[in-house]
Amino acid sequence: MTASTMPTAHPKRSLTPLVLVFLCALAPIVAAFVVYFNPQWWPQDQKNYGTLITPQRPVPEPGALGLTTLDGKPFDLRSLDGKWILLSVDQGACPESCARKLFIARNSHAAQGKNVDRLARVWIITDDAPVPDKVLTAYQGTVMVRARPDALREFLLGPQAATDDASALLGPIWVVDPLGNLMLQFPDNADGVSVRKDISRLLYNSRIG
């Protein structure tokens, strides 16, 4: 075999550059998760209006909440995993205080611009009263489901919540994160502008969802 016909030996390529590129791409995602789960590291000039829930409470199994759609079909809140959820609870007749929460949630959602698809709105109804047509029309796009108040109490109010205080469910607006954890509670009679700003900050600071 002559020198001209001998196979050329190719040097082995190092995987190091490829590994470094992969790690560089992964680093911001890892950092986002770490910062998200450590709110004390968030910028101090960005004080939350809502109250962070510590420890966060995961969405229970479907059977534990017993959620059903308005036409009686089972509904799993975890089907919305991957989205930030604005959640409120009230009676089907939806008095003015209820409509105000739905209004705040809808406007906070609509105001998120390019991030609008990262959010979902859920209203949990605690009785069998029919929902007024004007509410159904005004808040299209809100997921409306029913559940018993006692099934919601521990998840939304915590294990120490009074067992006979169903009215405590009717005031706040809550936030469930894209990983399926209840993580933020807005106060009764929340200020709509402050809620919207908090949601904007959450979406800005988080790469999840």
Regions inferred by a protein language model and the residue ranges of each:
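Conserved helix-turn-beta segment immediately C-terminal to the redox Cys motif
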Residues: 102-122
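Thiol-/selenol-based redox modules, centered on thioredoxin-like
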Residues: 169-209
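Short, internal strand/loop/helix patches
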Residues: 122, 127-171
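N-terminal "domain-start" segment that seeds a small globular fold
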Residues: 30, 40-77
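Short active-site neighborhood of thiol/selenol oxidoreductases, capturing the structured segment around
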Residues: 77-105
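Structural beta-sheet core signal
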Residues: 88, 121-124, 175
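Hydrophobic membrane-insertion alpha-helices, especially the h-region
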Residues: 16-36
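N-terminal Lys/Arg-rich, disordered targeting/topogenic segments
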Residues: 1-12
